[in-house]
């Protein structure tokens, strides 16, 4: 049996045409202060932030931006707030300032379609195998843990990818350099949350009994089951099917993945 579901929720009014009403605040920065929020005409689970455009690779990048004014950095030192190895963001209104006017809609946490597939297979006499898959297609997740473990700040427990951060010897990297605390909410930490999970497998076998044995025991069955046995995902975190906050959908702040469990049972029926 295959099930499919779709849910669409749009904000119709918040009292203002342009205002974003925050539902989850950025714990490490006040610009912008929110990551999730309600805005008229947008999904209920809308994600907001700056559009991350990598880092300044070389002086030529900085010089060319003097003409185009396409990008801007978060700290206003140097030419137009730029600096080699620092992150750059899309300057939406081309005013040379990184502020609320550059915050954009980064996607909805709601999946396009979700559901499951399950079936039971009877093999020979007494053996049955049941499988159950769940899935979610589309939608985005915000990896809040990257504000701590994927920034250039001098703090412990960094993600391995930070070994590839920008340096003079690695000038093509789009990961901000060490020593720069990149804690702004941006598209850098927004990921496709699609997944397919083998939720459970159940195997049962009924042992054949002779007529004589059935006078004492009517049935003996053995069972083996497992939960959360396999997960396919695009998300680089542990598991996109997690949530840290009860206020918003799909926010990962170092959440533990769903545990894998096994069970064995013997059933005797007299």
Segments from the language model and where they lie:
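Residues that define the transmembrane beta-barrel architecture of outer-membrane proteins
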Residues: 111-115, 194-199, 258-262
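Transmembrane beta-strands of outer-membrane beta-barrel proteins
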Residues: 129-131, 218-224, 264
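Extracytoplasmic gating/loop element in the C-terminal half of outer-membrane beta-barrel translocons
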Residues: 70-72, 81-84, 136-227
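Conserved small-residue
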Residues: 1-107, 227, 234
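Strand-connecting loop/turn motifs
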Residues: 124-126, 217-219, 259-261
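Repeated loop/turn-to-beta-strand initiation elements of outer-membrane beta-barrel proteins
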Residues: 126-129, 210-211
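Outer-membrane beta-barrel pore domains and translocons
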Residues: 3-7, 134-136, 223-229, 269
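C-terminal beta-signal and terminal closure region of outer-membrane beta-barrel proteins
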Residues: 22-57, 158-159, 163-165, 170-171, ...
């Amino acid at each position: 049996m295959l099930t499919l579901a779709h849910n669409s929720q749009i904000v119709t009014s918040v009292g203002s045409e342009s205002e974003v009403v925050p539902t989850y605040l950025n714990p490490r920065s006040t610009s912008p202060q929110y990551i999730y929020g309600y805005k008229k005409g947008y999904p209920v689970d809308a994600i907001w932030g700056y559009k991350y455009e990598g880092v300044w690779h070389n002086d030529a990048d900085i010089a060319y931006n003097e003409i185009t004014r396409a990008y801007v950095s978060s700290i206003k030192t140097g030419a137009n707030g730029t600096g080699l190895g620092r992150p750059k963001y899309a300057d939406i209104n081309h005013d040379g300032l990184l502020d609320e006017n550059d915050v954009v809609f980064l996607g909805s946490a709601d999946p396009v379609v979700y559901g499951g597939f399950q079936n039971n297979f009877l093999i020979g006499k007494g053996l049955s195998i049941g499988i159950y898959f769940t899935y979610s297609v589309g939608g985005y997740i915000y990896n809040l843990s990257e504000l701590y473990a994927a920034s250039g700040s001098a703090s412990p427990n960094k993600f391995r990818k930070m070994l590839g951060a920008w340096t003079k010897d690695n000038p093509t990297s789009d990961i901000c350099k060490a020593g720069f605390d990149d804690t702004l909410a941006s598209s850098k930490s927004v990921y496709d949350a699609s997944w397919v999970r083998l939720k459970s497998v159940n195997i049962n076998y009924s042992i054949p009994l002779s007529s004589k044995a059935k006078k004492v025991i009517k049935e003996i069955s053995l069972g083996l089951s497992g939960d959360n046995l396999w997960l396919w995902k695009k998300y680089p975190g542990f598991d996109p099917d997690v949530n840290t906050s009860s206020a918003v959908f799909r926010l990962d702040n170092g959440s533990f993945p769903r545990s894998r469990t096994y069970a064995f049972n013997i059933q005797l029926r007299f």
